[in-house]
């Protein structure tokens, strides 16, 4: 029986891993072990080596206080991979952790086959990372259509599989969803996404609340839904809402929330693709530690942070980044989209066109394409087909 060691450092990676495992375990004799969360554990019937929240870090500076803890987790993971006697190592995104693990494993197990899923954003900054990945990995699965040439030119086998956003099932019946959430017909719904990390939430929450307070003055029928990636984050957010004037509620059913909303105020990230795919207009705001920002600004080669804008080469979705992440600027744009259906509709239509570019040309699911490559090219001699 073949054995695959998976590593995912975030929930988005865990989702990808879980979907691939579901395809791999059909009609194959494969055992799964590694580091992941609910999707991978459930699909692969294994217990994660440790909770992925332990490695869910962000930023250049923010990671420094956790460097010793991170090193211990890297060493622990490397040791577990060696002891597992796995036939294949698959790492997913989270390059700050997964690359360091893979680099050590390559030194200790030079013959072990290794695949990485979700290419590092070398098109945005540090293009030299492509060479580093070529020295470590046997194959790379890219999720954006323009990424492969950056890696193939340095000798790394890179396959475009399509974006995982195409795996999601999105809701379209806004009326039914609003009834389910007990939203009145005359209410304007603004959904707010703050991310999953405590630091991100605390950094964005004050300016987001101030922005909402400003638009509430001209939109008394506003209802705000805070979407929770982790339900436990409600206790972080609630103290900030004690004296607000607007009505609000919490929801961990993010895809339903995106679909029923009139507008979204979103932290930059994968959530912006989900909101766009739900047919909801949005504004994106984001800021990081000032030292992290200075480092990023010196390295980065792109004008936008939202993937839809990056692919389009223009600002389809309004962005308010770092020093522009201010309540007055954000609230003005929120009001503009909330009360101008024409502008909101235009954003939705243009976003949908960009999303179609993330779909594999055969319309096959990314996880299915990935699983087929893994089975046929990396595991075939060891599994029962």
Curated annotation (Swiss-Prot):
- Superkingdom of the source? Bacteria
Q: Which reaction does it catalyse?
A: a lipid X + a UDP-2-N,3-O-bis[(3R)-3-hydroxyacyl]-alpha-D-glucosamine = a lipid A disaccharide + UDP + H(+)
Entries under SUPFAM superfamilies matching the protein: UDP-Glycosyltransferase/glycogen phosphorylase
The protein's matches in Pfam families, at most eight in alphabetical order, are given as:
LpxB
Q: Which InterPro entries match?
A: Glyco_trans_19
UniProt keyword annotation of Magnesium present: no
Molecular function per GO: lipid-A-disaccharide synthase activity; phospholipid binding
Q: In which pathway does it act?
A: Bacterial outer membrane biogenesis; LPS lipid A biosynthesis
- Gene Ontology terms: cellular component: membrane
One annotated GO biological process: lipid A biosynthetic process
- The UniProt record lists the keyword Lipid biosynthesis: yes
Q: What is its EC number?
A: 2.4.1.182
Q: Which PANTHER family match?
A: LIPID-A-DISACCHARIDE SYNTHASE, LIPID-A-DISACCHARIDE SYNTHASE, MITOCHONDRIAL-RELATED
By sequence similarity, the record places it as follows: Belongs to the LpxB family.
HAMAP family per UniProt: LpxB
Q: What does this protein do?
A: Condensation of UDP-2,3-diacylglucosamine and 2,3-diacylglucosamine-1-phosphate to form lipid A disaccharide, a precursor of lipid A, a phosphorylated glycolipid that anchors the lipopolysaccharide to the outer membrane of the cell.
Protein name stated in the entry: Lipid-A-disaccharide synthase
Q: What's the source species for this entry?
A: Rickettsia canadensis (strain McKiel)
């Amino acid at each position: 029986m073949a054995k695959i060691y998976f590593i995912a450092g975030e929930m988005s990676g865990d989702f990808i891993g879980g979907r691939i495992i579901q395809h791999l375990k059909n009609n194959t004799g494969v055992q799964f072990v590694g580091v992941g969360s609910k999707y991978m554990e459930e699909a692969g019937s294994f217990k994660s080596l440790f909770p992925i929240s332990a490695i869910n870090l962000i930023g250049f500076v923010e990671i420094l206080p956790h460097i010793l803890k991170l090193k211990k987790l890297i060493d622990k993971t490397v040791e577990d991979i060696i002891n597992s006697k796995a036939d294949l190592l698959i790492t997913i995104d989270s390059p700050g952790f997964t690359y360091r693990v893979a680099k050590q494993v390559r030194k200790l197990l030079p013959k072990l086959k290794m695949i990485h899923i979700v290419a590092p954003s070398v098109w945005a900054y540090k293009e030299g990372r492509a060479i580093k990945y070529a020295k470590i990995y046997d194959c790379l699965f890219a999720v954006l259509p323009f990424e492969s040439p950056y890696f193939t030119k340095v000798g790394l086998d890179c396959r475009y599989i399509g974006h995982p956003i195409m795996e999601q099932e999105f809701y379209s019946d806004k009326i039914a969803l609003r009834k389910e959430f007990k939203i009145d017909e005359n209410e304007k719904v603004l959904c707010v996404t703050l991310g999953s990390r405590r630091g991100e939430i605390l950094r964005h929450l004050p300016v987001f609340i101030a922005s909402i307070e400003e638009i509430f003055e001209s939109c008394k029928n506003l209802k705000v839904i805070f979407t929770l990636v982790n339900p436990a984050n409600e206790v972080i957010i609630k103290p900030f809402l004690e004296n607000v004037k607007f009505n609000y509620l919490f929801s961990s059913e993010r895809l339903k929330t995106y679909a029923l909303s009139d507008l979204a105020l979103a932290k930059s990230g994968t959530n912006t693709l989900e909101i766009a795919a739900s047919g909801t207009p949005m504004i994106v705001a984001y800021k990081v530690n000032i030292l992290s920002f200075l480092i990023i600004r010196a390295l980065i080669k792109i004008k936008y942070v939202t993937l839809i804008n990056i692919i389009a080469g223009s600002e389809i979705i309004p962005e308010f980044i770092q020093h522009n992440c201010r309540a007055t600027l954000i609230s003005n744009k929120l009001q503009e989209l909330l009360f101008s259906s024409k502008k909101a509709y235009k954003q939705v239509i243009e976003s949908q066109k960009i999303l179609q570019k993330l779909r594999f040309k055969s319309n096959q699911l990314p996880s299915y394409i990935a699983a087929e490559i893994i089975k046929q090219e990396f595991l075939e001699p060891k599994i029962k087909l």
